[in-house]
Amino acid sequence: MIDLKYGDIKESLPKRILDKFCRNAFRDATLYPKNYDTLISRLAKKHNVRQENIVLTNGVDEGIDLIARVFGKDILLFAPTYYEFLDAPRRNNLKYEMIDCFDENGYSIKYREDDVKNKSLIFLCNPNNPFGLLNKEEIIGIANKTKGIVAVDETYIDFNGESVINEFESVPNLLILRSFSKGYSLAGLRIGYIAGKAGLIEKIRQRKLVCNVSSVSVNAAMIALDEGKYFRNLINKIKKRKDGFEGFLRQEGFGIIHTHTNDIIIKFKNLADADKFCSFLGSKKVIVNQGNGISTCGLDKTFVRFACGTEKQMKDVERIVKKYNPGY
């Protein structure tokens, strides 16, 4: 089976990094977490901000949920986007509005000033999940037009895009969510963080659990920071592999929507064609998402989305796709 449903990094960590985890990440496993400040200090130094500007979260999902609960009286989303942006207000019985930003010309943020002016919270992804890319000026422009908070999920920032993590001093209603899931391949350890003005971060800190992240995850994150060169090279390899596979699909006649993440997206002309393709892949034990799948909102079932896997996985999928006949 080739499971490409989830957008995590498919490569296993190299032995030398795993050995570091075994020696160091688990050393405090018997103790309640006491190492938050050490990681926060390192992140503050990395981003050239103060420690009071950062709070650790149990992955980006907890960060989204916390921000929604603290600031989300009236939330605005731009679809298609990450499903948790929709799930958090639904789960917490919060008011929300979703604007569709995809048409025949592609993805672009579309709004009237009245759409954003009085919202208490606006969620953005940059790069967007599943596709689309905002420039810094667009994000700051939205932040300057609203009285509320603009929370920017930068989970995929290592794949592409221009971060706004150093803009919150001049744009005080910005909150930036980061994750170790994609840029550092630690999706299974559920560790992320939020950066922003100290006053906003303190409001979030007051609502989170005291021990919301395990000491194992914190120690692993610090090891990952030490191995930044390895992870940067890995992301570049994945980007190159994904772009190559997109090129292959175009040559085979598929309609491709280029992404700025590790996702590959095919847009079919009709539902029947998408159904046939997914049925064919399923018969070959290749698992993909049709429509929203498990992590997206705003896609209909003419979209087929899957992660860029390992080099071997993608070569195997390429061989399988070459055998596809639309009359299957």
Question: Which residues make up each language-model segment?
Answer:
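Short acidic capping loops at alpha-helix termini that bridge into adjacent secondary structure
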Residues: 50-54, 154, 172-173
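Short loop-beta-helix segment that forms the pyridoxal 5′-phosphate
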Residues: 44-66, 78
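PLP-dependent aminotransferase class I/II
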Residues: 12-14, 35-37, 173-250, 254-257
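Active-site phosphate-binding strand-loop segment of PLP-dependent enzymes
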Residues: 102-158
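PLP-dependent aminotransferase-like
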Residues: 69-124
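N-terminal "arm"/small-domain region of PLP-dependent enzymes with the aminotransferase-like
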Residues: 1-31, 118, 328
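Conserved PLP-binding catalytic core of the aspartate aminotransferase-like
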Residues: 252-284
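Conserved PLP-binding active-site segment of the aspartate aminotransferase-like
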Residues: 5, 196, 265-271, 285-328
